[in-house]
């Protein structure tokens, strides 16, 4: 969309209504410019795929973004619920924005119903439409979905990530959302 024309993070704040942005101490000027421009392109894809306005990317103005600033071990990117910030790692975050925004949207939905956390993990307090969506990740026609079976398989293969991480409702929500965005863009 922009062909690497932006050199200042202000464009992300203005276009998408983000609350703030942060760069890690070890990001070079070149890293920062690359991150800004890749995030711009990813956000352009995201709002078009979801069918919202660019400003709605910030989920009511509360979402922030960081680049190489808040890394966690081997993660490519992560969403911090308590800070409402998406962190893209310096070297491995490319392609992860839709997934992390899915986590942010999950939290935003919960917030709309007075719940701190993820809507997908607090179904008893959510409307039927959210319950039905999350249930569809795990079960169709009384049988476990391939998506859920595969997620449980990864739970067994990658135990270091935490027991049940891959098959947790909030992780499945974010992965399903990222797939939805990809399908809409194809």
Where are the regions that the model predicts?
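Active-site-flanking segments in enzyme catalytic domains
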Residues: 1-37, 44, 48-186
């Amino acid at each position: 969309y922009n062909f690497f024309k932006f050199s200042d993070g202000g464009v992300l704040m203005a276009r998408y209504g983000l609350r703030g942005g942060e760069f890690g101490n070890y990001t070079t000027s070149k890293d920062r410019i690359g991150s800004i421009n890749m995030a711009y392109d990813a956000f352009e894809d995201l709002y078009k795929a979801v069918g919202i306005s660019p400003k709605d990317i910030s989920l009511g103005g509360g979402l922030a973004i960081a680049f190489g600033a808040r890394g966690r071990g081997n993660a490519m990117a992560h969403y911090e619920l308590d800070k409402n910030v998406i962190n893209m790692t310096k070297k491995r975050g490319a392609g992860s924005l839709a997934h992390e925004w899915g986590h942010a949207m999950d939290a935003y939905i919960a917030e709309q119903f007075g719940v701190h956390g993820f809507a997908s993990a607090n179904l008893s307090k959510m409307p039927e439409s959210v319950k039905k969506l999350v249930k569809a990740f795990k079960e169709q026609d009384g049988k476990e979905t391939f998506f859920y079976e595969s997620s449980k398989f990864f739970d067994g293969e990658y135990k270091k990530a935490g027991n049940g991480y891959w098959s947790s409702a909030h992780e499945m929500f974010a992965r399903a959302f990222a797939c939805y965005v990809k399908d809409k863009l194809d």
